[in-house]
Amino acid sequence: MPEGDTVLQTAKRLHTALADQVLTRSDLRVPRFATADLTGRTVLGTLSRGKHLLTRIEGGLTLHSHLRMDGSWRVYATAERWRGGPAHQIRAILSTADHTAVGYRLPVLELLRTVDEGKAVGHLGPDLLGPDWDPDTALHNLLAAPARPLGEALLDQRNLAGIGNIYKAELCFLARATPWLPVGDLPATTAVRLVATAKQLLEANRDRPVRTTTGSRARGYLPTERLWVYGRTHRPCLRCGAPIRAAEQDTRPTYWCPRCQSGPTP
């Protein structure tokens, strides 16, 4: 599941493959930009902003994409077989002499002027992995609506950018609060520590191929000890042994330990 750390990794891969290279092929398979032709333009670079990707292109253009739940960018050598999914799932193709970047299942793909990037990402709060990171502003934003459930406040990218559903559940566990606890009910020291922990976790995972919040490097698709609660329904809590519970919050699954975490539950 793409979150701020994995989106940053995607940006790095795209930047390494495309930056300072001339596009030999461009194909944007979305109706609004289907006729756009970027062939012959030089890619200036790719960067991430929260969970958004911005690929800047010669001529004052930016290709903005967002992966949401299922999207991905894959980079292939020129003669390499594409293995990211069936052809009908491809939304973008950017080729240079040496590499091809293929965007699969991209729910957001738009071409805009670079000077207008703010229309796509200007609403975001401080980026946990960006140069604009400001913990004080992030904390202020997070607590601005005291009655709002903590889980919802953490997912709101206007508060702080980069947290997705996995980090939401993990941060609530580490704060010993259920995702439904009103954010204003967090003790002041806990709220400060929560923001610092969010930064610490994303920084720790920014270059890791497998995300972990517990320190474990175990691999595998099935839930392991890499995460405290996410995806571990009915498994014993790694701290107290109580079975982890799961429920939906704002249409997304969330996870918590009924013994370690205090606050309202469904």
Each PLM stretch: what is its role?
Residues 3-6, 10, 19, 117-120, ...:
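Alpha-helical structural motif
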Residues 63-174:
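Phosphate/anion-contacting hairpin/loop surfaces
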Residues 1-104, 108-112, 239, 252-256, ...:
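A cross-family signal for N-terminal binding/gating loops and helix N-caps
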Residues 5, 20, 27, 37, ...:
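Acidic-enriched, low-complexity/disordered segments with a strong bias for Aspartate over Glutamate
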Residues 22-38, 44-47, 81-83, 141-266:
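Basic, nucleic-acid-binding surfaces and adjacent catalytic neighborhoods in DNA/RNA-processing proteins
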